[in-house]
Amino acid sequence: PEFKDAPAWRKSGIDILNREVNVQVYNDGGQFELDPHYHLAAINIFCKALGIADANGFRKEFPQDYLDTIESMIMFYANISFPDYTNPCFSDAKLTTKKEMVKNYKAWSKLFPKNQAIKYFATEGKEGVLPDYMSKGFLKSGFFVFRNSWGMDATQMVVKAGPKAFWHCQPDNGTFELWFNGKNLFPDSGSYVYAGEGEVMEQRNWHRQTCVHNTVTLNNKNLDTTESVTKLWQPEGAIQTLVTENPSYKNLKHRRSVFFVDNTYFVIVDEMTGSAKGSINLHYQMPKGEIANSREDMMFLTQFEDGSNMKLQCFGPDGMSMKKEPGWCST
């Protein structure tokens, strides 16, 4: 008799979860913190509620759109992940391991047994089917994935250029990570730790800076505004294209166009327009290892022995110079 109000309590909890899943998750499956690891945590929180309902025979009390939203979140995460199951370390994200992610996919596959892509990742390709597309855009969340394969030999770029987000997000609109033939060639700087005192916060704030991401700054300052708008997304054809625009600073707008040419190489065009004055700085976070460079030719070339190398060639107005700066990568 002391649990006579249990149905009302249960309904209240389910109503709160259903409300939150609609508040926190955009219609493209992206979680509103725009942080891959927080996104992953949110998936599992919502899934645990389903697991408890299943254990007690109350699954039917969850509306279908609750399940549909979780499934779309899983597919979002699968798309932005790299072939080795790791994730871009945008915002406050930490690097996941393949072992951890296979375990997650196995649990998700039990919830969504008809989803062949989830089954594929759960079984490491032994069962299921990969998505029938390569590149994929999530326009509301502002995540865009160019790829020419789902395999380890893929060329894959993940671009982050979304709306204004929340505490776990960083001022990094336009940044990207690039995977090539088994290696992440433009790793994000990461986040260090969530919070602390003194030197800890100094380190966290260093990792949050716009200037330590693969994007453009004015006078190396953090972006004033982080509200990117997608002007064009064309994920098919010989020249796949993304054009995104952000009102980065007062009186200075940044338009970044990314072209994936012949499924082979990328051309990035950055245009800054406005009356603001100062130094425009284009930042690239290079991977750990030996790098050959030519300041006269504005060129970088990685020197990895395994052959997973890339050449970065920059072009710009007369007077443009190149400077090496220290970089750190927190995973």
What are the functions of these language-model segments?
Residues I16, E20, A42, M73, ...:
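Alpha-helical packing segments of well-folded alpha/beta enzyme cores
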Residues Y26, G30-F186, P235-E236, V243:
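Carbohydrate-active enzyme catalytic cores, enriched for enzymes
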Residues D153, F166, Y194, L223-T225:
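Short, acidic Gly/Pro/Ser/Thr-rich loop/turn segments
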Residues E2-V25:
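Alpha-helical cores of eukaryotic small-GTPase signaling modules
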Residues F3-D5, R19, A55, G151-D153, ...:
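Secondary-structure boundary elements
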Residues F186-S189, A195-E197:
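Cytochrome P450 core scaffold surrounding the K-helix E-X-X-R motif
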Residues A93-K94, K98-V102, K110, G196-T331:
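CBM-like, beta-strand-rich accessory domains located in the C-terminal region of large
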Residues A161, S189, L218:
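Active-site donor-binding loop signature of nucleotide-sugar glycosyltransferases
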